[in-house]
Swiss-Prot record:
Region span, Disordered: 430-474
Catalytic function, reaction form: L-ornithine + NADPH + O2 = N(5)-hydroxy-L-ornithine + NADP(+) + H2O; L-ornithine + NADH + O2 = N(5)-hydroxy-L-ornithine + NAD(+) + H2O
SUPFAM superfamilies in alphabetical order: FAD/NAD(P)-binding domain (SSF51905)
Binding site for FAD: 50-58, 69, 520-522
The protein, known as: L-ornithine N(5)-monooxygenase
Described purpose of this protein according to its UniProt entry: L-ornithine N(5)-monooxygenase; part of the siderophore basidioferrin biosynthetic pathway. The biosynthesis of basidioferrin depends on the hydroxylation of ornithine to N(5)-hydroxyornithine, catalyzed by the monooxygenase SMO1. The second step, the acylation of N(5)-hydroxy-L-ornithine is catalyzed by a not yet identified N-acyltransferase. Finally, assembly of basidioferrin is catalyzed by the nonribosomal peptide synthase (NRPS) NPS2 via amide bond formation between three L-AHO molecules to release the linear L-AHO trimer.
Induction profile: Expression is induced under iron-depleted conditions.
EC number(s) given by UniProt: 1.14.13.196
InterPro entries: FAD/NAD-bd_sf, Lys/Orn_oxygenase
Cofactors named for this entry: FAD
Ligand binding (NADP(+)): 223-226, 300-302
C-alpha cells in the first residue's frame, strides 16, 4: 500500500468524456481573466484516475463507417464557450482538416473521428496542467479525520493500492455492461460478448469458430442502435466466411414487435437542451419527471437510427430477392451471404452452456462450444429452444456503481446511506423538507418514506412519514421497503445530511432521474461541466 501526501483540490473518478469536459472547463478557468484571484481550484492540484491504460471511448463499438447521432457542435465546450480552445472546430483547425470537413456537407462526424477528437482534447488538457493517472482502478472512497476524502485505487498491473486525499470529488463512473439475468449466470464465457466489447473481441471470436467450416449461428439480443450495428457488422463479416452447404445465421432476439426508429426531429431533440434540463429538474413532483422520461423514451432507449433501419431492411429485402431467384432457377448453389432473421416478441427464458453443439463438421469431426437459449413468446408464452455458437448482448448498461461505492463507504452515513439502503431515490435538493421556521430539515434515517420495493429508479412521491412499528411490520409483510432519499443540487452536487461534512461530491452521467434524458449522453457535456466547475470555484476557499 502506498500513501501519497499531497492534498488535492479535486479528484475525478474516471476520465471519459464527462470528466474530460470538467477538465476542459477547469483549464479555461485557469486561463481566464479571473485566473490568479482568490478561491478556485489550484493549478496542479487536480487529478483524474482512469482504469484504462490510455484515453478510451467505447472502443468496442468503433465499427467501420458508423456515424455520431448528434451534431459536432454538441462537443466538450461549444454550447458553453464557443471560443474555447477545446471545441471540435478547434480540433479540426489544429489537425488541418477544417475545410475538408466543411466540404463533407455533414454536421455528424464518424464515430472514429469523434474518438480522435476526444483523444486530442485529453492530450491538450494534460499539456495545460491537468494530471491523469491511467492504469489505476478506484476501489473505494473513505472519510478522513481532516474532513477530506480518501480515494483508494489499485494499480491494474501491480495490484498496489494507492491512497490519495482530496477536498472535492467528481464521480463519473460511466456504465457497466448489463447482461440479461440468465446470461449473466454463464458469464464470463468465451462465446458470450457484450456489445461494449464487440469490436475489440469479434475477430478473436470468429477466428476460433472459422475452422469448423460449417454454418455458424449467432444470436444478437437487443433492439437498440448497438444491436442493429452489431447485426449488420456480423452480416458483413460472416458473408465472407465459408460456411458449408448453408449460409451462416444471425438471429436478432427482442421483446418489441419490430425495430423502432429513434425520434430525432427538431422539436423532440429539444428534450436534450440545457434549458430542458432546468425545466425537468424543477418539476414539482417525481411523478412529473417520470412522465417526461417516459414520453421521450423513444429518443434514446431501444430505438435505432432510421438510416440504420433502412440499411437493415435493405439487407433483409435482398435475402427475399435471392430466395425468389433461386426458387425460379432451381439453383441449389451455396448462398454466399449470411442471413439475418428477426425474432420479435421474444424474451430470454433460460440459457445453458453447451459443451458441444449437436451438429458437428462431418469432414473434421470437430465441434464448437455453444449456448442453448430457451425463448418465450411474450403473448402466447410458447417456448422454443435454439442452439448458438455465440451470443452478443446489446442490452445496455448499469449506471449505479457510484451508489454501491457510497453505500459501502463510511462517507455514505453523511447522506443517509448504508449497506441496507435499498431502494434509493435521487431527488432534487429543492424538495428537501423544511422545518417550521423555514430552515432546511436535517435529513436523516427518520425521514424515510414508504413504497413497494423496486430497483434504483425514480419513484412515485409519497408524503414524509415515520411509520409506527405496526405499520413497519405490515409494510414488510406486503413486500414494501423504506426508501432513502438522496438529494442533489441543480449543479450535480450531493447534499449531505449535515453541514459538518465539508467535501463536495458531484455526480456525472448518472442523474437521469433528476436532470433528464440527456444526463448519460454527450449533448450537454460542455454546459454541465461549466455548472460543476463554477460551483466548485464558488465554494472553494
Amino acid at each position: 500500500m502506498e500513501a501519497q501526501d499531497p492534498l488535492f483540490d479535486l479528484i475525478g473518478l474516471g476520465f471519459g468524456p464527462a470528466n474530460l469536459a470538467i477538465a476542459g472547463a477547469i483549464v479555461e478557468k485557469w486561463e481566464g481573466p479571473s485566473a490568479g484571484g482568490d478561491g478556485g481550484i489550484s493549478a496542479h492540484k487536480v487529478l483524474f484516475i482512469e482504469k484504462q491504460p490510455e484515453f478510451q471511448w467505447h472502443p468496442g463499438m468503433l465499427l467501420p463507417n458508423t456515424r455520431m447521432q448528434i451534431s459536432f457542435l454538441k462537443d466538450l465546450a461549444t454550447l458553453r464557450s464557443p471560443q474555447s480552445p477545446l471545441t471540435f472546430l478547434s480540433y479540426l483547425h489544429a489537425e488541418g482538416r477544417l475545410l475538408p470537413f466543411i466540404n463533407r456537407g455533414s454536421f455528424t462526424p464518424t464515430r472514429r473521428e469523434y474518438f480522435d477528437y476526444l483523444s486530442w482534447a485529453a492530450r491538450t488538457v494534460e499539456s495545460k496542467g491537468i494530471k491523469v493517472q491511467y492504469g489505476e482502478e478506484v476501489v473505494s472512497i473513505r472519510g478522513s479525520e481532516d474532513n477530506t476524502v480518501e480515494v483508494h485505487s489499485r494499480d491494474v498491473k501491480t495490484g498496489t493500492i494507492v491512497i490519495r486525499r482530496t477536498r472535492n470529488l467528481v464521480i463519473s463512473p460511466g456504465g457497466n455492461p448489463k447482461l440479461p439475468p440468465n446470461i449473466s449466470l454463464l458469464y464470463p464465457h468465451p462465446r458470450i460478448l457484450h456489445s461494449s466489447r464487440y469490436a475489440t473481441s469479434v475477430d478473436q471470436l470468429l477466428g476460433t469458430l472459422s475452422p469448423a467450416n460449417r454454418p455458424l449461428r449467432i444470436a444478437v439480443i437487443g433492439s437498440g442502435q448497438s444491436a442493429a450495428e452489431v447485426t449488420l457488422d456480423l452480416h458483413s463479416r460472416l458473408s465472407s466466411m465459408p460456411g458449408g452447404d448453408r449460409p451462416h445465421a444471425i438471429d436478432m432476439i427482442f421483446r418489441n414487435g419490430s425495430l423502432k426508429p429513434s425520434d430525432d426531429s427538431p422539436f423532440s431533440n429539444e428534450i436534450f437542451d440545457p434549458d430542458t434540463t432546468e425545466v425537468i429538474y424543477n418539476l414539482p413532483t417525481q411523478s412529473d419527471r417520470e412522465n417526461i422520461l417516459k414520453e421521450y423514451n423513444n429518443t434514446n432507449y431501444s430505438v435505432v437510427n432510421p438510416r440504420t433501419i433502412d440499411a437493415m431492411y435493405e439487407v433483409m429485402y435482398d435475402q427475399k430477392l435471392d430466395d425468389a431467384i433461386a426458387r425460379r432457377k432451381g439453383d441449389k448453389a451455396t448462398p454466399s451471404a449470411a442471413r439475418i432473421t428477426m425474432h420479435p416478441h421474444m424474451t430470454l427464458y433460460f440459457a445453458d452452456d453447451l459443451p458441444q453443439l449437436a451438429e458437428t463438421d462431418s469432414a473434421t469431426e470437430t465441434s464448437q462450444e455453444g449456448i442453448r437459449l430457451t425463448l418465450q413468446n411474450v403473448f402466447s408464452q410458447a417456448q422454443s429452444t435454439r442452439d448458438y455458437d455465440a451470443v452478443v448482448c446489446a442490452t445496455g448498461y448499469d449506471r449505479t456503481s457510484w451508489l454501491r461505492m457510497l453505500t459501502s463507504s463510511d462517507i455514505g452515513k453523511h447522506f443517509g446511506l448504508n449497506l441496507s439502503s435499498d431502494p434509493v431515490q435521487l431527488v432534487p435538493s429543492t424538495e428537501i423538507p423544511k422545518g417550521p421556521d423555514g430552515s432546511l430539515f436535517d435529513a436523516s434515517e427518520e425521514e424515510a418514506t414508504w413504497r413497494p420495493a423496486s430497483p434504483i429508479t425514480p419513484a412515485s412521491p409519497s408524503p414524509p412519514s415515520t411509520p409506527t412499528s405496526s405499520a413497519l411490520s405490515q409494510s414488510r409483510m406486503l413486500g414494501q421497503l423504506p426508501i432513502t432519499k438522496l438529494y442533489i443540487t441543480r449543479e450535480y452536487c450531493l447534499v449531505p445530511n449535515s453541514p459538518q461534512f465539508k467535501p463536495r461530491i458531484y455526480l456525472q452521467g448518472c442523474t437521469e432521474a433528476t436532470h433528464g434524458l440527456s444526463e448519460s449522453l454527450l449533448s450537454i457535456l460542455g454546459v454541465r461541466a461549466g455548472l460543476v466547475v463554477d460551483d466548485l470555484w464558488k465554494n472553494s476557499q
